[in-house]
Amino acid sequence: MIEIPSDLHPDLVPLAFLLGNWAGAGVSDFPGAEKCNFGQEVTFSHDGRDFLEYVSHTWVLDDEGKQVRPLETETGYWRIDKDRKVEVVMARDQGVIEIWYGELADQKPQIDLVTDAVARTAASGPYSGGKRLYGYVKSDLMWVGEKATPEVELRPYMSAHLKKVVTPEEVAEMARNLPDMPDDGIAFFK
């Protein structure tokens, strides 16, 4: 069930399904990078203004689902307009800042995003842009990300299945049962 806080800015009601603390596991696989399972914690929060604050922490998991090392941290701000157009400003610890645009689907809690602008530091490594799909399915938050570099065309590179605040043991169990990422990257949306 989706709860709508009484102090949520009215413009954000369509994004209320994102609110809360989420945790789970996913798969990362991209040419030139380590293929791994990862754990993830995501928080979507609000303070009454017309945006959601987003923070995501990921870490590499071993075969038993235990944390090995940090993978990536993202932080950002999500907005939606009256036409269900979504905009996201995001910064990553790897030295990348992105502006994403997309929209909330009609009649279902699903958001498709694509990068509009990317700025990166020299240390960040190659990155040209990406796409993301977020969906609220049976009270879980699922997402798949695609990215492109000058050398690699746009392709899936990460996907995750998140539940509202779960224990570390539940995250480990989810990680042990993850399938490999399929070629189309839509591991959790079929």
Swiss-Prot record:
Database matches in SUPFAM superfamilies: Lipocalins
Gene3D superfamilies, sorted: 2.40.128.20
Database matches in InterPro entries: Calycin, Nb(III)_bact/plant, Nitrobindin, THAP4-like_heme-bd
Motif GXWXGXG, chain ranges: 20-26
Domain of life: Bacteria
PANTHER family: PEROXYNITRITE ISOMERASE THAP4 (PTHR15854:SF4), THAP4 PROTEIN (PTHR15854)
Family: Belongs to the nitrobindin family.
Protein name in UniProt: Ferric nitrobindin-like protein
Species in which this protein is naturally found: Streptomyces griseus subsp. griseus (strain JCM 4626 / CBS 651.72 / NBRC 13350 / KCC S-0626 / ISP 5235)
Organism phylogeny: Bacteria, Bacillati, Actinomycetota, Actinomycetes, Kitasatosporales
